[in-house]
């Protein structure tokens, strides 16, 4: 049985006071939810403050990125070990915005994933196709390449620390959402590829999240699909009531 994960990616939003106010609002909404793993990913500068705010509740902390070296002359970077020290249990790696704006490649994603696993973090590994790639009927080709390259060199045991997040780039922040059926087809393909690269048993246990304009209004239909194990939520994770409603999609 794969435990669902609802993860909120705050992107470049919420200073310290805003983050703490959000957590204070969210906790009462989700504190009785025991059958869903809840993760929030604030900006680096508020990680420690948010960790203190969620210390006694069922919410876990993620960063939005990391570097592949643990320390050194790498100005502006944050290492996986530093994220653990700040209280993180998870880290998002390979988000489409990192790929689009900051030169992230499959190679750098792979290096970051290996470093994060070594530090003990659970990785939310993002993959997904652009609109042009989908219209050129290259969705499966793109997903397979991203999975093969991103997970290259990982041992089977490492997959216990991997959660895959499928984010069709054309549906991020656009208000467009893949239909439940489109999302399920992509998720089933991702699970198939993981089975081919590792084992069918690993593929059956790995959790695959959907990310692409997830809202309270569409989360239940997505979560009813057999290969969708959760959501990586963007805009709707910035308001406690909407994120709480997504977390409590079973209610």
UniProtKB/Swiss-Prot annotation:
Keywords: Cytoplasm, Gluconeogenesis, Glycolysis, Isomerase. It is found in: Cytoplasm. Its main location: cytoplasm. One of its GO terms (biological process) is glycerol catabolic process. Pathway: Carbohydrate biosynthesis; gluconeogenesis; Carbohydrate degradation; glycolysis; D-glyceraldehyde 3-phosphate from glycerone phosphate: step 1/1. Substrate binds at residues 9-11, 173, 213, 234-235. GO terms for molecular function: triose-phosphate isomerase activity. It catalyses: D-glyceraldehyde 3-phosphate = dihydroxyacetone phosphate. InterPro entries: Aldolase_TIM, TIM_sf, TrioseP_Isoase_bac/euk, Triosephosphate_isomerase, Triosephosphate_isomerase_AS. The keyword Iron does not apply. It comes from the Bacteria. One of its GO terms (cellular component) is cytosol. Its EC number is 5.3.1.1. PANTHER family: TRIOSEPHOSPHATE ISOMERASE (PTHR21139:SF42). Homodimer. This is Triosephosphate isomerase. It comes from Geobacter metallireducens (strain ATCC 53774 / DSM 7210 / GS-15). The lineage of its organism: Bacteria, Pseudomonadati, Thermodesulfobacteriota, Desulfuromonadia, Geobacterales.
